[in-house]
Each structure stands twice: as C-alpha cells, then as structure tokens.
Amino acid sequence: MNTNQNTNLKEITMYTDGACSGNPGPGGYGVVMLYKGHRKELSAGFRDTTNNRMELLATIVGLETLKEKCNVNLYTDSQYVVNAIEKGWAKKWRANGWMRNKKEPALNPDLWERLLKLCEFHNVKFNWVKGHAGHPENERCDQLAVAAAKQPNLPLDVR
C-alpha cells in the first residue's frame, strides 16, 4: 500500500462489496466509484466461488478500472481485505511463498498478488465500514453483488 497521498492525482472514493450464496457457491461483487460528481457502478457474478474471493475481486476490478495513478479512499465491509493490507499480512504471505505460517497456505494468492501490485501503483487508503448498517454506498454495492450472483449462466471463477 502506498499511503503517500499526492495532491496532483485524482481523488477517487470507492466502495466495494462481495457476496456469495453457499460459500462456496454462486457469488458476485459490486463496486461504486465516485469522482467529482461522477458515479460508476461495476458488478459481475461467478459460480463456485467464495465470499472472500468476491470481496477481493471487487477491490481489484475497481482499482484496475482506473486509467491512471490515483489517490483512492476505498471503503469495504471486509475485515479480511482491510486487515490483510493495512496490517501487512498479505505482504508477509507473499514474502513467505504464499504461506500464512509453516503449515498453512494463504488463500487466494492469485488475487492477493493482483491487489498488492495495484496498491503499489495507486495511493490506496483502506477503510472498514460496518456491513448492512445503512451506509448507502455500501448497501448499493451489496445490492449489485447479490444481483450479479443471481444471474443465469454464471462463468467460472477467475482462478
């Protein structure tokens, strides 16, 4: 994570959420991006995925959508995502060959690698928000994610 905010960069506010029915099961992600009065919403669904993969993918897709380096205030209800980045867990897992400890592999290394690279490019500040607590943008992300997970003929997860 690059927390040195550059005042010459665009300031993006991003909300993300993932949802999964069954865990594993069909899942989806939702993203709401805000910039100077503009709004962009993104969502997609996959079959046979997990909630954590969808939380990660929401964050990744949102950041990958940005066409240039930006300052990003990212809000998610996923403590998994926030803690792994803010507490440095994901970087430690990568340094240890994607192992959480000597016996347990870290889950979702494909997605963590993508997210870490994006965080090295953008200036991202991760913020945790309580899910299902009435925050309008977080609620919208949840609606997008749940609706995406219910679509017919979902593709396989992006593993």
UniProtKB/Swiss-Prot annotation:
Its cofactor is Mg(2+). It catalyses: Endonucleolytic cleavage to 5'-phosphomonoester. GO terms for molecular function: magnesium ion binding; nucleic acid binding; RNA-DNA hybrid ribonuclease activity. Disulfide bonds: none annotated. It is found in: Cytoplasm. InterPro entries: RNase_H, RNaseH-like_sf, RNaseH_domain, RNaseH_sf, RNaseHI. One of its GO terms (biological process) is DNA replication, removal of RNA primer. Mg(2+) 1 binds at residues 17, 55, 77. Residues 8-150 form the RNase H type-1 domain. Monomer. Endonuclease that specifically degrades the RNA of RNA-DNA hybrids. HAMAP family: RNase_H (MF_00042). This is Ribonuclease H. The gene is rnhA.
